[in-house]
Amino acid sequence: MNKLLIIDGMNLVRRIHAAQPNESDITGLKERVHGACRKLLKYHIPTHAAIVWDGDAISWRKTLFPDYKKGRKPMPEALANGLNDIKAYLAEHHIHSVDADSEADDVIATLATKLVNIDGEAIIVSTDKGFSQLNHPKIKLWDHFNQTYLTIEEMEKKLGIERSQLIDYLALAGDSGNKIPGVPGIGPKSAVELLRIYRSLASIYNSIDKVGAKQAKKLEAGKQMARLSYKLVQLKTDMPLSVNLKQFRIKKPDSE
């Protein structure tokens, strides 16, 4: 069975770089990133591997909602200037890079979905909880920094919802890290309680007359924001890709 290791490039690199006291110093960074990739390959033993990078184009999410990710700390200039060197170094060691036009998330989701649809297995290396919405038994999420899988049970316990409700939850409660608004006045606790009773965002709005007056007023006022937030958090799994699985095959063990 084909097993594809998909690494969220910027998620990995920025966290490795964050351990550096001086953000302008990228000395040894490419070697540390390569070391992390070697460790991932050794542990998971995939048949194929790719590291996916964000691109510079404005994402469809930013076009839809200009405040998306607004205020997020920009990438340090030294790191931005060193990315091509990191990619080249990884390529020398047989780790294939995929450059997304804008956000890597949708490309990662598409790669994973395409593979499991042909009976393969995908392991996504990222700390981004948004990938939890890819509800398939052969798609696994690996947190490299905590050296653990993000399990369904752990996510459900942490958020108080079922995995299938993640998009509905974020549409209601929002996601401050990505500046996704959610419904004003409906926080995490209210979102969990509403989903416990009504199960989904659509059912909540279809049952608005049964919701308490105070919450119903907030939900009605924030209906458009809920719809917008739902779109923003939902991963696309049908992105056009100009790559094929053969490109990602691991040609030989990386034993350097």
UniProtKB/Swiss-Prot annotation:
Enzyme Commission number(s) from the entry: 3.1.-.-
Required cofactor names: Mg(2+); K(+)
Cofactor binding note: Binds 2 Mg(2+) per subunit. Only one magnesium ion has a direct interaction with the protein, the other interactions are indirect.
Origin: domain of life: Bacteria
GO MF entries: 5'-3' exonuclease activity; 5'-flap endonuclease activity; DNA binding; magnesium ion binding; potassium ion binding
Region feature (Interaction with DNA): 185-190
Residues in 5'-3' exonuclease domain copies: 163-256
Biological process annotations from GO: DNA replication, Okazaki fragment processing
Keyword presence, Metal-binding: yes
Classification via InterPro entries: 5-3_exonucl_a-hlix_arch_N, 5-3_exonuclease, 5-3_exonuclease_C_sf, DNA_polI_H3TH, FEN, HhH2, PIN-like_dom_sf, Xni
Keyword annotations from UniProtKB, A to Z: DNA-binding, Endonuclease, Hydrolase, Magnesium, Metal-binding, Nuclease, Potassium
Residues involved in K(+) binding: 172-173, 181, 183, 186
Positions annotated to bind Mg(2+): 105
Function text: Has flap endonuclease activity. During DNA replication, flap endonucleases cleave the 5'-overhanging flap structure that is generated by displacement synthesis when DNA polymerase encounters the 5'-end of a downstream Okazaki fragment.
The family this protein is said to belong to: Belongs to the Xni family.
Name of the protein in its database record: Flap endonuclease Xni
Species name: Shewanella pealeana (strain ATCC 700345 / ANG-SQ1)
